[in-house]
């Protein structure tokens, strides 16, 4: 979203540091603090929520790799994971987040998992249904500004390569098979279909 607004997309280290500061500010404000904050990226002076929440508001953070998983475990209440390959999601996100949670002696790691799934009768139907979403899994999607260019990139790749980035179901039973492991194996508190 930065590119269309004329901003450069920062490298991961800066994005992570910005997220860390943001989460710290948000949590402290939600907890009722009158906040003076002087960070590298953000500053506040006497910031306060004058209508604070009555109950704890959980902060969820998406993570796609071990660094973000550690950041989520430390600063958020839960981690959101896009599961393409369940084994890969466990190794790259869930295990690091759980290990960081144990290291910090926290007991509140909550999981929200989701999968990009097409409900289609066959591959042709699925390919057509994916038309406006194909670029979502194209290479360089974090650097490219124009969604149309991402779709063109995706359309230039072998169809199977793009289709393999999504799950496909043609019946409710197949849909259950795709999503059941997110509950049974991952123990997700929230599963998005």
Regions found by a protein language model. Give the residues of each.
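Active-site-adjacent structural elements that line small-molecule/cofactor binding pockets in enzymes
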Residues: 1-193
